[in-house]
Amino acid sequence: MSFTPGKQSSSRASSGNRSGNGILKWADQSDQSRNVQTRGRRAQPKQTATSQQPSGGNVVPYYSWFSGITQFQKGKEFEFAEGQGVPIAPGVPATEAKGYWYRHNRRSFKTADGNQRQLLPRWYFYYLGTGPHAKDQYGTDIDGVFWVASNQADVNTPADILDRDPSSDEAIPTRFPPGTVLPQGYYIEGSGRSAPNSRSTSRASSRASSAGSRSRANSGNRTPTSGVTPDMADQIASLVLAKLGKDATKPQQVTKQTAKEIRQKILNKPRQKRSPNKQCTVQQCFGKRGPNQNFGGGEMLKLGTSDPQFPILAELAPTAGAFFFGSRLELAKVQNLSGNLDEPQKDVYELRYNGAIRFDSTLSGFETIMKVLNENLNAYQQQDGMMNMSPKPQRQRGQKNGQGENDNISVAAPKSRVQQNKSRELTAEDISLLKKMDEPYTEDTSEI
């Protein structure tokens, strides 16, 4: 007598639609209206349009009785301990609990940023003697197949289990006996979260409800999910990650401490590997402008490669091959001026080069390039000329325009000649007054 998962052994599979206890229809194994041709064991697989996987991925023409287990961490092996790994199915005795997990390589899709993302594989369980490897013996070394069986099962004979017809039988949420250790980096579809290494049956079944239902696995009726695609969760996760990645590239506020760290990091690099920016200016990286370093002026000296005009100039920069093979090179030993005298001296060499970059008016952005070059070539000469010009005479505090020549005249009128701080010769009248001040004072007693 053949057994039907999800039903008691005394009952036979019906040809009509059903919604039994603990049964859930999954979107990756949606039912299609079709005629039932056979109900016997090892029936010919029935392919449907939903079993075809576009955009890559292998075809799964067989419908598993259970929901899949999806990988969410790369590099994790799918494996169970001996005697574990067979899902619980009402109506299936322990002697028939034997089969294999089949790896389904899913398709890739385009993310929000335009890149192709390969979905991690999903594993489905098939009873021994059914599914894509129905003719293979238990334990055969097959890539993408992991064999499992209970301790009571005889793996030398196929399981007496019917194939699932999605038009009448719905997929069962995957549950395991207590003590089953799930593979690391995998989660059970429909559980709503990644599965830890050890999970009891009650906890696994409590998270096997559909997205729109709060009922538990022991409820009488469960509403089938609808409007859900098998890879919707992965697509949503990828979109969220892409969004986070985009937001993460937004410019962050740079503090004095971080600016100092960035500057020091740039200066620790060899001179020919430095890229000046806002935190480490051109002068800090390469020194002041002069005859030997004659490019840069104005904002470009402050912003360096962060200047909006710099990218168009970078198009003119030679490649490494053009630098070495298209230039005149000369190796010269120079004096080491760095380090203390008590430190061991190092031999310092300069690879001097002389070359040219040729371009014409047909170059894209030619006018802009010429404008930027004219503004920055030998710009230090104009800056030095402006600094060497005689500064405009500044008027003193409290001095009005037009009174610059009268340096000794105060704006406010002095109260006395002493405040003017000016010297002059004594007149005869002054001498007469001084003599009278020296004479003794006598009271005038004459009558008027």
UniProtKB/Swiss-Prot annotation:
State one molecular function term (GO): RNA binding
| Keywords associated with the record | ADP-ribosylation, Host Golgi apparatus, Phosphoprotein, Ribonucleoprotein, RNA-binding, Transcription, Transcription regulation, Viral nucleoprotein, Virion
SUPFAM superfamilies listed in its UniProt record: Coronavirus RNA-binding domain, Nucleocapsid protein dimerization domain
Q: Where is the composition biased (Polar residues)?
A: 29-38, 45-55, 399-409
- Region RNA-binding: which residues? 52-194
Q: Where is the CoV N NTD domain?
A: 61-190
Q: Where are the compositionally biased (Low complexity) regions?
A: 9-22, 193-223
InterPro entries registered for this protein in UniProt: N_prot_C_CoV, N_prot_N_CoV, NCAP_bCoV, Nucleocap_CoV, Nucleocapsid_C, Nucleocapsid_N
- Tell me the Pfam families matching this sequence: CoV_nucleocap
What segment(s) does the record annotate as region Disordered? 1-55, 157-231, 266-297, 385-448
Query: Which top-level group of life is the source organism from?
Result: Viruses
Q: What does this protein do?
A: Packages the positive strand viral genome RNA into a helical ribonucleocapsid (RNP) and plays a fundamental role during virion assembly through its interactions with the viral genome and membrane protein M. Plays an important role in enhancing the efficiency of subgenomic viral RNA transcription as well as viral replication.
- Provide the protein name: Nucleoprotein
Q: Which gene encodes it?
A: N
